[in-house]
Amino acid sequence: MESVLLSARCTANTATVFWNKPENATADTVYEVSLDGGHSVHTNRTHYTFTELIPNTEYCVTVYSIGSIHICTLPARRRIYVTEEPYNAVGDGKTLNTAALQQAFTDCGPNDEVYFPAGIYLTGALDLHSCMSVCLEKDAVLQGSSDPTDYLPRIWSRFEGTEQECYRSLLNAGQLDHTAGANCENILLYGKGTISGGGHVLAERMIDIERENLREYLAQNAALVATCENDRTIPGRVRGRLINLSNCSRIRITGLTLQNGAAWNVHMIYCDDIVTDHCTLRSGGIWNGDGWDPDSSTNCTLFATEFETEDDSVAIKSGKNPEGNAINRPTKHICVFDCHSNGGHGICIGSEMSGGVADVQIWDCDIAASSNGIEIKGTPKRGGYVRNVTVRDCTFPRLLIHSVPYNDDGIPAPEQPYFEDFHFERLHLTGQKQEHGTVESVA
């Protein structure tokens, strides 16, 4: 792992420390944690959050048998209330607030935070920028509209492994550039509120518009369409996500409910150092409704998160043949731990993995309420590799490592993909897959 054994992320009043599970640890291992050498707390999880801290203050956190880390809470920030002058956003769930909210986001400096009090704030696409913070209070909902025109103009993005123009997502950060590093950094999205997309209605409207735009192309390429999952696959690739991070670094999303993107909920493309923790991700009834998707990204960490998704709760990707082979940006150093599913397909690597996937660590997850559990997949055309995957102390319905027939258009890579160096330890495989409220035995 490139990431250090012990890490921390802070707000003004909290510090969350998290660490890699030691090789000799088991599901019963208990860790002792202290702040500035004071009273110790004990936890059987590989993370702990200290609360009621003083802003802009240095502390030392010790996890005995792991190590110590010096941290500094964030300074208290000036709050930009979206409901006050000059923004006057209306949280009635009916008034479209896009212009007002975008102005608040634009005005947010490094020492500010955009603050949403309780209410339902209807909006179209919004753009984030470096060094900003957004706080959603309990019962505050940032609600994406179901009108595709509210997500124009389109932006350059990547969906199912191919770069193309897509509708903007509800929240957008960074500009896509597979030749470069980060162009947007240091963003904090936090609170106890909800970020909710336009969901199924928005998705279907986007697909219908694009199907009409591509009518002649689809008619002339019937053989290509026949290789797709269905006739909505190609037009469906223009959908935005709930949160789209392109070429971003040092982003944290914590405490929020994230739900109902038009496709995937959180999508990281060409990113580094992304932390998502203590969130709830939902996407019931949404086609391709993934939860958390690192895509040609590095050092991404997900923990203490609940899932109820229509598709993969987690999907680790790195592009699709032939473009993914040419761009050749692997996804690596991914940690997923202490996560729980209440529906969905489970934790997946692939099938878009043409740029390669390496060093994935998964531990202490209960994904029993899913259809697939842990799944590593590709197609013979993909090329690339998946290697160095470690999964420990988890519950799944089953473990799948296989080739799949869908999303298989595109020119084949010169070689088939390589799957190698997988380590599985102390897994509880229930043999009972769960999908849409039904339970079925698996072989």
Range-by-range predicted roles:
Residues M1-A443:
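Extracellular/periplasmic carbohydrate-active domains that bind, remodel
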